[in-house]
Amino acid sequence: MAGLKLLKSLALHDDKCWSVDVNNGGIMATGSTDRKIKLVDIRSFQIIEELDDTAHKKTVRSVAWRPHSNILAAGSFDSTVSIWGKDDDGYNDENDLETELLAIIEGHENEIKCVAWSHDGELLATCSRDKSVWIWEADEMGEEFECISVLQEHSQDVKHVIWHQSLPLLASSSYDDTVRIWKDCDDDWECCAVLNGHEGTVWSSDFEKSNSNVRLCSGSDDGTVRIWCLEDDNGEYEQEWIQESILPKAHTRAVYSVNWSPKGYIASTGSDGRLVIYKESEDGWIVECIHELTHGVYETNMVKWVEYGSKDVILLITAGDDGHVNVWKFDEN
């Protein structure tokens, strides 16, 4: 029977921890209501650096590493995005230079809820309470950003954005109970599909890490996790997506975060504090394991699989309202 083992509980923040991300060098970044961004070595669990908390006036809601780099984006409730970077030597014992603030991106009119890099690191997507998604083109150094598209078809607060790992597709999740799929159409980003079915805010979504299927999982205020599948892509402006399945009911309250692992597992967590692992079988999706009180009596805001290190060791990271980041080992057997 699969199970979860807590490897380390890191008391990193004085208030809610909202977001975590780990780069390919094993450096974890965290963002919090206390406005601080902390960098932690996932191997030693040691804090490497605390970034200047004067960069943001309010909550740091989302952090995301640019792929294959030492450049970090952080989105804040002060409606700005900060970009941080370190030289090519990266985070090692010999490099004692501080991470620099490279840029501040402005444009949104309200709280930023999520930031996400495209798989090639050329584009940064941001979403906000102002109901919009912005797409920015970044230079190689992470110092210059040009807005190339503003997407305004959601009718409410946009909670989350995520890019497909290889295709030019972006998914956005919203308080309007929908997920929208966007694609690059002749250098102009267009909404090619609206995924309807959830009966509450869609807090998070994630694409399957597969080269054969284009599928998306989503988690909602209605307590469900759903799977969506691309059925038809005419190559132009519209795509046909279907709701493939609703995963077995395992949450009693809102699902805040979902994440699809390279091995095919889906992890979800949320307001009830549960960490749930799902597995696809020949007969459909099953609940592989449930861990109660992931952060004690506090809500769990985010879950993320870690692709760093040995392929034989599967790690999960959760962030909670207690200000802690918990590192878990997932045992498939």
From Swiss-Prot:
Presence of the UniProt keyword rRNA processing in the record: no
GO cellular component: cytosolic [4Fe-4S] assembly targeting complex; nucleus
One BP term from GO: iron-sulfur cluster assembly
Entry-linked Pfam families: WD40
Entry keyword set: Cytoplasm, Nucleus, Repeat, WD repeat
Subcellular location: Cytoplasm; Nucleus
Superkingdom, natural source: Eukaryota
PANTHER family in alphabetical order: CYTOSOLIC IRON-SULFUR PROTEIN ASSEMBLY PROTEIN CIAO1-RELATED (PTHR19920:SF0), WD40 PROTEIN CIAO1 (PTHR19920)
Quaternary structure and partners: Interacts with NAR1.
Name of this chain's protein: Probable cytosolic iron-sulfur protein assembly protein 1
Organism of this sequence: Kluyveromyces lactis (strain ATCC 8585 / CBS 2359 / DSM 70799 / NBRC 1267 / NRRL Y-1140 / WM37)
Gene designation per UniProt: CIA1
